Amino acid sequence: MSSQCGSADVTAPKPKGLFNYFSSALWDYNVALVQMLALCPALAVTTTATNGLGMGLATTLVLMITNAIISALRHSISPAVRNPLMIGIIAGVVTLIDMAINAWMHELYKVLGLFIALIVTNCAVLGRAESFCSRNPVLPSILDGRRAWASGFTWVLVVIGGIREILGQRARCSPRPRLLLGEHFRWLEITVLPGFQGILLAILPPGAFIVLGFVLAFKRVVDRRRAERRIRTHGELVVLQ
Protein backbone atom coordinates (compact mmCIF):
# COMPACT_ATOMS: atom_id res chain seq x y z
CA MET A 1 0.00 0.00 0.00
CA SER A 2 2.80 2.40 0.88
CA SER A 3 4.37 2.22 -2.57
CA GLN A 4 1.04 2.91 -4.24
CA CYS A 5 0.29 5.77 -1.87
CA GLY A 6 3.73 7.25 -2.35
CA SER A 7 3.37 7.25 -6.11
CA ALA A 8 -0.17 8.60 -6.07
CA ASP A 9 0.99 12.18 -5.88
CA VAL A 10 3.86 11.97 -8.35
CA THR A 11 1.70 12.32 -11.45
CA ALA A 12 0.87 15.94 -10.65
CA PRO A 13 3.50 18.30 -12.06
CA LYS A 14 4.87 20.99 -9.80
CA PRO A 15 2.78 24.14 -10.40
CA LYS A 16 4.45 27.53 -10.75
CA GLY A 17 3.01 30.40 -8.75
CA LEU A 18 0.56 30.58 -5.87
CA PHE A 19 -2.58 30.68 -8.04
CA ASN A 20 -1.46 27.70 -10.09
CA TYR A 21 -0.63 25.84 -6.88
CA PHE A 22 -4.15 26.30 -5.55
CA SER A 23 -5.70 25.56 -8.94
CA SER A 24 -3.68 22.37 -9.25
CA ALA A 25 -4.63 21.03 -5.83
CA LEU A 26 -8.24 22.23 -5.72
CA TRP A 27 -9.21 21.32 -9.28
CA ASP A 28 -6.67 20.06 -11.82
CA TYR A 29 -5.23 17.28 -9.62
CA ASN A 30 -7.90 17.06 -6.96
CA VAL A 31 -7.31 14.18 -4.55
CA ALA A 32 -10.82 12.76 -4.90
CA LEU A 33 -11.88 13.77 -8.42
CA VAL A 34 -8.65 13.15 -10.34
CA GLN A 35 -6.41 10.91 -8.26
CA MET A 36 -9.53 9.01 -7.08
CA LEU A 37 -8.18 8.60 -3.54
CA ALA A 38 -10.10 8.57 -0.24
CA LEU A 39 -13.36 7.62 -1.93
CA CYS A 40 -14.51 5.56 1.07
CA PRO A 41 -15.30 8.61 3.25
CA ALA A 42 -16.37 10.59 0.19
CA LEU A 43 -19.14 8.06 -0.42
CA ALA A 44 -19.92 6.85 3.09
CA VAL A 45 -20.17 9.94 5.29
CA THR A 46 -21.48 12.50 2.79
CA THR A 47 -25.17 12.08 3.52
CA THR A 48 -25.17 15.76 4.56
CA ALA A 49 -22.94 18.76 3.94
CA THR A 50 -22.27 18.96 7.69
CA ASN A 51 -20.91 15.41 7.76
CA GLY A 52 -18.72 16.12 4.75
CA LEU A 53 -17.38 19.30 6.32
CA GLY A 54 -16.66 17.52 9.60
CA MET A 55 -14.77 14.72 7.85
CA GLY A 56 -12.87 17.21 5.72
CA LEU A 57 -11.81 19.27 8.74
CA ALA A 58 -10.71 16.13 10.58
CA THR A 59 -8.60 15.11 7.58
CA THR A 60 -7.16 18.62 7.37
CA LEU A 61 -6.08 18.52 11.02
CA VAL A 62 -4.48 15.12 10.51
CA LEU A 63 -2.60 16.40 7.47
CA MET A 64 -1.33 19.52 9.22
CA ILE A 65 -0.11 17.71 12.35
CA THR A 66 1.42 14.72 10.58
CA ASN A 67 3.07 16.97 8.01
CA ALA A 68 4.71 19.00 10.78
CA ILE A 69 5.93 15.94 12.70
CA ILE A 70 7.26 14.09 9.67
CA SER A 71 8.96 17.21 8.33
CA ALA A 72 10.60 17.90 11.71
CA LEU A 73 11.92 14.33 11.85
CA ARG A 74 12.88 14.05 8.18
CA HIS A 75 16.65 14.09 8.86
CA SER A 76 16.39 11.55 11.68
CA ILE A 77 14.30 8.91 9.91
CA SER A 78 16.14 6.08 8.21
CA PRO A 79 14.86 5.31 4.69
CA ALA A 80 14.56 1.65 5.69
CA VAL A 81 11.86 2.38 8.28
CA ARG A 82 10.42 5.60 6.85
CA ASN A 83 7.11 4.23 5.61
CA PRO A 84 6.24 2.17 8.72
CA LEU A 85 7.18 5.10 10.94
CA MET A 86 5.06 7.53 8.95
CA ILE A 87 2.09 5.17 9.14
CA GLY A 88 2.60 4.94 12.90
CA ILE A 89 2.70 8.74 13.23
CA ILE A 90 -0.44 9.11 11.12
CA ALA A 91 -2.22 6.45 13.19
CA GLY A 92 -1.27 8.19 16.44
CA VAL A 93 -2.50 11.58 15.23
CA VAL A 94 -5.74 10.07 13.91
CA THR A 95 -6.32 8.43 17.29
CA LEU A 96 -5.91 11.79 19.05
CA ILE A 97 -8.27 13.52 16.61
CA ASP A 98 -10.77 10.68 17.02
CA MET A 99 -10.69 11.02 20.81
CA ALA A 100 -11.00 14.81 20.62
CA ILE A 101 -14.07 14.66 18.38
CA ASN A 102 -15.59 12.03 20.66
CA ALA A 103 -15.01 14.27 23.68
CA TRP A 104 -16.05 17.67 22.33
CA MET A 105 -18.33 16.86 19.36
CA HIS A 106 -19.92 13.60 20.42
CA GLU A 107 -22.99 14.02 18.20
CA LEU A 108 -20.77 14.44 15.16
CA TYR A 109 -18.64 11.52 16.32
CA LYS A 110 -21.70 9.26 16.37
CA VAL A 111 -22.31 10.13 12.72
CA LEU A 112 -18.74 9.84 11.44
CA GLY A 113 -17.92 6.87 13.66
CA LEU A 114 -15.50 4.37 12.14
CA PHE A 115 -14.63 6.57 9.18
CA ILE A 116 -12.42 8.86 11.26
CA ALA A 117 -10.13 5.92 12.02
CA LEU A 118 -10.01 5.09 8.30
CA ILE A 119 -8.07 8.32 7.70
CA VAL A 120 -5.03 6.19 8.55
CA THR A 121 -5.55 4.25 5.31
CA ASN A 122 -6.05 7.42 3.27
CA CYS A 123 -3.40 7.24 0.55
CA ALA A 124 -3.58 11.00 0.09
CA VAL A 125 -2.25 11.55 3.62
CA LEU A 126 0.61 9.05 3.35
CA GLY A 127 1.43 9.98 -0.23
CA ARG A 128 1.70 13.68 0.58
CA ALA A 129 3.80 12.96 3.66
CA GLU A 130 6.23 10.86 1.64
CA SER A 131 6.45 13.00 -1.47
CA PHE A 132 6.51 16.48 0.09
CA CYS A 133 6.90 16.61 3.87
CA SER A 134 9.84 14.22 4.06
CA ARG A 135 11.79 16.58 1.78
CA ASN A 136 10.72 20.07 2.93
CA PRO A 137 10.89 22.25 6.07
CA VAL A 138 8.16 22.31 8.71
CA LEU A 139 6.31 25.52 7.80
CA PRO A 140 5.89 24.77 4.08
CA SER A 141 4.75 21.26 5.03
CA ILE A 142 2.08 22.59 7.41
CA LEU A 143 0.85 25.10 4.84
CA ASP A 144 0.86 22.41 2.16
CA GLY A 145 -1.47 20.23 4.19
CA ARG A 146 -3.76 23.09 5.20
CA ARG A 147 -3.94 25.26 2.14
CA ALA A 148 -4.84 23.24 -0.89
CA TRP A 149 -4.61 19.46 -0.83
CA ALA A 150 -6.86 19.06 2.22
CA SER A 151 -9.07 21.91 1.03
CA GLY A 152 -9.56 20.18 -2.31
CA PHE A 153 -10.69 17.03 -0.54
CA THR A 154 -12.95 18.98 1.83
CA TRP A 155 -14.84 20.90 -0.83
CA VAL A 156 -15.59 17.68 -2.70
CA LEU A 157 -17.06 16.15 0.48
CA VAL A 158 -19.16 19.25 1.15
CA VAL A 159 -20.47 19.42 -2.43
CA ILE A 160 -21.38 15.72 -2.57
CA GLY A 161 -22.94 15.91 0.89
CA GLY A 162 -24.86 19.06 0.02
CA ILE A 163 -26.30 17.58 -3.18
CA ARG A 164 -27.34 14.36 -1.43
CA GLU A 165 -28.80 16.36 1.45
CA ILE A 166 -30.89 18.62 -0.76
CA LEU A 167 -32.16 15.74 -2.89
CA GLY A 168 -32.70 13.21 -0.12
CA GLN A 169 -33.68 15.07 3.04
CA ARG A 170 -36.62 17.22 2.01
CA ALA A 171 -34.32 19.84 0.47
CA ARG A 172 -33.07 20.97 3.87
CA CYS A 173 -29.60 22.43 3.74
CA SER A 174 -27.52 21.61 6.84
CA PRO A 175 -30.32 20.31 9.09
CA ARG A 176 -27.78 19.62 11.82
CA PRO A 177 -25.38 22.58 11.99
CA ARG A 178 -25.30 22.08 15.76
CA LEU A 179 -23.04 19.06 15.20
CA LEU A 180 -20.21 21.46 14.38
CA LEU A 181 -21.30 24.83 15.74
CA GLY A 182 -23.60 24.08 18.67
CA GLU A 183 -27.27 24.54 19.49
CA HIS A 184 -27.19 28.30 18.91
CA PHE A 185 -26.71 27.78 15.17
CA ARG A 186 -29.92 25.90 14.42
CA TRP A 187 -31.03 28.98 12.49
CA LEU A 188 -28.64 27.96 9.72
CA GLU A 189 -31.15 25.34 8.63
CA ILE A 190 -32.53 26.34 5.25
CA THR A 191 -35.34 24.80 3.20
CA VAL A 192 -34.26 25.11 -0.42
CA LEU A 193 -37.36 23.67 -2.12
CA PRO A 194 -40.49 24.00 0.05
CA GLY A 195 -42.86 21.08 -0.36
CA PHE A 196 -40.24 18.79 -1.90
CA GLN A 197 -40.44 15.39 -0.21
CA GLY A 198 -36.96 14.22 -1.10
CA ILE A 199 -35.56 11.26 -3.02
CA LEU A 200 -34.67 8.33 -0.78
CA LEU A 201 -32.08 7.01 -3.24
CA ALA A 202 -29.96 10.13 -2.75
CA ILE A 203 -29.11 9.31 0.87
CA LEU A 204 -28.54 5.59 0.23
CA PRO A 205 -25.13 4.15 -0.81
CA PRO A 206 -26.12 3.85 -4.50
CA GLY A 207 -27.03 7.53 -4.44
CA ALA A 208 -23.50 8.38 -3.34
CA PHE A 209 -22.06 6.68 -6.43
CA ILE A 210 -24.58 8.41 -8.69
CA VAL A 211 -23.87 11.87 -7.26
CA LEU A 212 -20.11 11.26 -7.46
CA GLY A 213 -20.56 10.24 -11.09
CA PHE A 214 -22.39 13.49 -11.88
CA VAL A 215 -19.71 15.54 -10.11
CA LEU A 216 -16.98 13.75 -12.08
CA ALA A 217 -18.91 14.27 -15.32
CA PHE A 218 -19.33 17.97 -14.53
CA LYS A 219 -15.59 18.31 -13.95
CA ARG A 220 -14.82 16.54 -17.23
CA VAL A 221 -17.14 18.89 -19.12
CA VAL A 222 -15.59 21.97 -17.53
CA ASP A 223 -12.06 20.70 -18.22
CA ARG A 224 -12.91 19.97 -21.84
CA ARG A 225 -14.38 23.43 -22.39
CA ARG A 226 -11.37 25.04 -20.74
CA ALA A 227 -9.08 23.05 -23.02
CA GLU A 228 -11.08 24.06 -26.10
CA ARG A 229 -10.96 27.71 -25.01
CA ARG A 230 -7.19 27.53 -24.58
CA ILE A 231 -6.82 25.96 -28.02
CA ARG A 232 -8.94 28.71 -29.62
CA THR A 233 -7.02 31.41 -27.77
CA HIS A 234 -3.68 29.91 -28.77
CA GLY A 235 -4.82 29.65 -32.38
CA GLU A 236 -5.91 33.30 -32.43
CA LEU A 237 -2.56 34.36 -30.99
CA VAL A 238 -0.73 32.38 -33.66
CA VAL A 239 -2.82 34.03 -36.40
CA LEU A 240 -2.18 37.50 -34.96
CA GLN A 241 1.56 36.85 -34.83
UniProtKB/Swiss-Prot annotation:
Keyword Cell membrane belongs to the record: yes
Gene Ontology CC terms, in alphabetical order: plasma membrane
UniProt KW keywords: Cell inner membrane, Cell membrane, Electron transport, Membrane, Translocase, Transmembrane, Transmembrane helix, Transport
Localization (cell): Cell inner membrane
Predominant place of localization: membrane
Residue ranges of the TM segments: 25-45, 53-73, 85-105, 107-127, 148-168, 198-218
Topology within the bilayer: Multi-pass membrane protein
EC id: 7.-.-.-
Enzyme class name: translocase
Superkingdom classification of source: Bacteria
Swiss-Prot/TrEMBL GO biological process terms: electron transport chain
Subunit-level organization: The complex is composed of six subunits: RnfA, RnfB, RnfC, RnfD, RnfE and RnfG.
Function: Part of a membrane-bound complex that couples electron transfer with translocation of ions across the membrane.
Family per record: Belongs to the NqrDE/RnfAE family.
PANTHER family given in the database record: ELECTRON TRANSPORT COMPLEX PROTEIN RNFE, ION-TRANSLOCATING OXIDOREDUCTASE COMPLEX SUBUNIT E
This protein's name: Ion-translocating oxidoreductase complex subunit E
Species of provenance: Stutzerimonas stutzeri (Pseudomonas stutzeri)
Source taxonomy: Bacteria, Pseudomonadati, Pseudomonadota, Gammaproteobacteria, Pseudomonadales
